[in-house]
Amino acid sequence: MSSDVLFTPATDTTGWRINGDRLWASLMDLAQIGATPKGGCRRLTLTDLDRQGRDKVIGWAREAGMSVTIDKIGNVFMRREGRNPGLPPIVSGSHIDTQPTGGKFDGNYGVLAALEVVRTLNDLQIATEAPIEVVFWTNEEGSRFVPVMMGSGVFAGVFPLEETWAVTDKEGVSVGEALEQIGYIGEQTPGDHPIGAYFEAHIEQGPILEDEAKTIGIVQGVLGIRWYDCVVTGQASHAGPTPMRLRQDALQVATRIMQEVVAIADAAQRLGYPARPIVSGAGHDAVYMSYLAPTGMIFIPCKDGISHNEIEYASPEHVAAGANVLLQVMLQYARPV
């Protein structure tokens, strides 16, 4: 791992805030694409409604001065350049596809919170040392094509691209055909895109934060059926004449792996938000990103813990709070200049 993107304490940015009204308006605007009678959203992956949602988010990104790259599984990366474009970008996002009877916030919040970070930096006329990218991944939900977290899984090398293209829905339409139909099969090979660190803001999809009156959940892990022991292997060298930048130092890398969680906790504390550690009971694209780069997740409460449902709801105050934490964390890694 390059020492160029190791955690660096930021300038004092505690007073900086995202525009909560703008973020809320964007969430409500995107939710109109595929809106359901009960106030939810039905925007299945790689349908025309998905195309409309993608077009809208990309339009907003371009208005914010961002460049756009699409890979061969339809993952979309929107980039705000850094002062040092050679550094791997600090990336944040989620997904915009929904369940058949889904809500306004699942996935969409993570993408638009990340976009709001960029808009806020533009408002403040703040440049960053490292580039910042907003991503939305293809088919996180798995409600039309199986498996879930498809786009991030292909990106991480978990699912072979050509095999994934061949997966069909119940009508016999393949992923590859659907990508072609909506015009979102890009040129970049999935995975040929560096990531310095990855952060994902998300509704909790459970009742714990609301029950305990906590504003921020600092995600410690995602439940699964596999457990891993992580062994970081370095190379011994004389401590005196070998500078840190030329070492293969195992402790340095292991420390970096832990810093994302610490950064989120620190940001929540500095902003004065009640927070607690939490484990995610649902899967997220951040799982596969953790295979590739240091990764963190920020949870906010959702009413009654309800998600994957048309009545899914998060308050404007919590939506803004999570995005403010995301702003602080991304700045600690992208480094304002």
Say what each PLM segment does.
Residues 2-47, 308:
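N-terminal capping segment at the start of a domain
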Residues 21-36, 93-94, 275-324, 333:
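Zn-dependent metallopeptidase/amidohydrolase metal-coordination segment
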Residues 35-81:
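A non-catalytic alpha/beta surface segment that caps or lines the substrate-entry region
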Residues 64, 76-109:
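Catalytic-core environment of secreted peptidases
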Residues 74-76, 96-98, 132-143, 205, ...:
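Acidic, glycine-rich active-site loops and adjacent beta-strand->loop/helix elements
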Residues 98-171:
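A generic, well-ordered mixed alpha/beta core segment in the N-terminal half of proteins
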Residues 139-140, 144-266, 270:
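Midchain, well-structured core segments that form catalytic/ion-binding scaffolds
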Residues 238, 242-264, 300-337:
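His/Asp/Glu-rich mid-to-C-terminal helical/loop segments that flank catalytic regions of hydrolases
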